[in-house]
Curated annotation (Swiss-Prot):
The gene is rocD. It comes from Macrococcus caseolyticus (strain JCSC5402). It is an enzyme of class 2 (transferase). Pathway: Amino-acid biosynthesis; L-proline biosynthesis; L-glutamate 5-semialdehyde from L-ornithine: step 1/1. It catalyses: a 2-oxocarboxylate + L-ornithine = L-glutamate 5-semialdehyde + an L-alpha-amino acid. This is Ornithine aminotransferase. It comes from the Bacteria.
């Protein structure tokens, strides 16, 4: 038995079976490449669901981690830290928002945005007590917490977790008329992913996000953009809402905010929204901790200084063009923005992901029939050519 097999066996024996990973153990990583304990090398085309946009173990981010770990790692929010304020300023200026509320995981940030929207509806908009509604999209993925699965349209995500939370309405993603029809005087917010990741890299028609912005403004409804996966350069823009040149009332960020090194997430909005919170009304022991802020500060610098959004746009167009050249009836569609690409098949995608793994390329199926390609944004064109060669091999069989 190899070391990898032994580790997988131990993991399966002691771990709850809530994941179905490809049978590979990663023990080392750098840039776009990872290794298993046996020394086999693989290209990472998943980026930990877009958390590793800056590449594995980016030296500037690792240096920030080490330096901060030698100073102070956790203060709780009972005290100030010298990292929190400067990080607040940096992320607010990047997003063009007045305030930020830090958390740790994406799902926590979604919960925070929902709480903010509801309290805003009661305290600012004047919605009657416990009547606030939030409109979300079918096919959404906002996390695994109870609120997040309560607004999901996937029955399996909800099975056995009832009673679910109320106050959510679901409409078709991309259908502005359904959103208009769903709005009532009690509507607090419209919550959506500008590009639906887990649903199969679903991209709305050009102009849809602008329509959502306009409808929300007309009806005094908050527009909340969950940019956890599609944001921070992944789509070829700093924020995926930039594709329609719109600014939501709230950004939800996570994943690449920590540079693939440390978990950190946040909600960004203007004062009118986030000032609905008062001391003790929301919080997190680890949210905004010094280590996370130092790491995120470096991660944001890397995104901006290395122009990773622009790089994603250029290389994404190149990679998509090469994928579209593959002539195979199994391939139904190639779609994406930047280096956030889905190849939809006419059959199950996992067997193809397993074949690609054997050729040294790691990717993951999503929504059963879609192969998601989302490499670190630091990837080179030469590496993309290598990846294309492997994909062509699999689809030439």
């Amino acid at each position: 038995m190899t070391k990898s097999q032994d580790i997988i066996e131990i993991t399966n024996h002691y771990g709850a079976p809530n994941y179905h990973p490809l049978p590979i153990v990663i023990s080392e990583a750098e840039g776009v490449w990872v290794k298993d304990p046996e020394g086999n090398k693989y290209m990472d085309m998943l980026s930990a669901y877009s958390a590793v946009n800056q590449g594995h173990r980016h030296p500037k981010i690792i240096q920030a981690l080490k330096e901060q770990a030698d100073r102070v790692t956790l203060t709780s929010r009972a005290f100030h830290s010298d990292q929190l304020g400067p990080w607040y300023e940096k992320i607010c200026k990047l997003a063009g928002k007045e305030m930020v509320l830090p958390m740790n995981t994406g799902a926590e940030a979604v919960e925070t945005a929902i709480k903010a929207a509801r309290r805003w509806a009661y305290d600012v908009k004047g919605v009657a007590k416990d009547q606030a509604e939030i409109i979300a999209m079918k096919g959404n993925f906002h996390g695994r917490t109870l609120a997040a699965v309560s607004l999901s349209s996937e029955a399996e995500y909800q099975r056995g977790y009832g009673p679910l939370l109320g106050g959510f309405k679901l409409v078709e993603f991309g259908d502005i008329e359904q959103i208009k029809s769903a709005i009532t005087p009690n509507t607090a917010a419209v919550l959506l992913e500008p590009i639906q990741g887990e649903a199969g890299i679903n991209i709305p028609e050009d102009g849809f996000l602008k329509q959502v912005r306009d409808v929300c403004t007309e009806n005094n409804v908050l527009f909340i953009a969950d940019e956890i996966q599609a944001g921070l350069g992944r789509s070829g823009k700093m924020f995926a809402t930039d594709w329609d040149n719109v600014v939501p009332d709230m950004y939800i960020l996570g994943k690449a905010l920590g540079g693939g090194v440390f978990p950190i997430s946040c909600v960004l909005a203007d004062k009118e929204i986030l000032e609905v919170f008062n001391a003790g009304s929301h919080g997190s022991t680890f949210g905004g901790n010094p280590l996370a802020c130092a790491v995120s500060n470096a991660a944001l610098d890397v995104l901006v200084d290395e122009k990773l959004a622009e790089r994603s746009l250029e290389l994404g167009e190149y990679f998509q063009s090469k994928l579209k050249e593959i002539d195979n009836p199994v391939i139904k569609e190639v779609r994406g923005k930047g280096l956030f690409i889905g190849v939809e098949l006419n059959e199950a995608a996992r067997p193809y992901c397993e074949q690609l793994k054997e050729l040294g390329l790691l990717c993951k199926e999503t929504h059963d029939t879609v192969i998601r390609f989302a490499p670190p944004l630091i990837i080179s064109q030469e590496d993309l050519d290598w990846a294309i060669d492997k994909v062509k091999q699999v689809f030439s069989k």
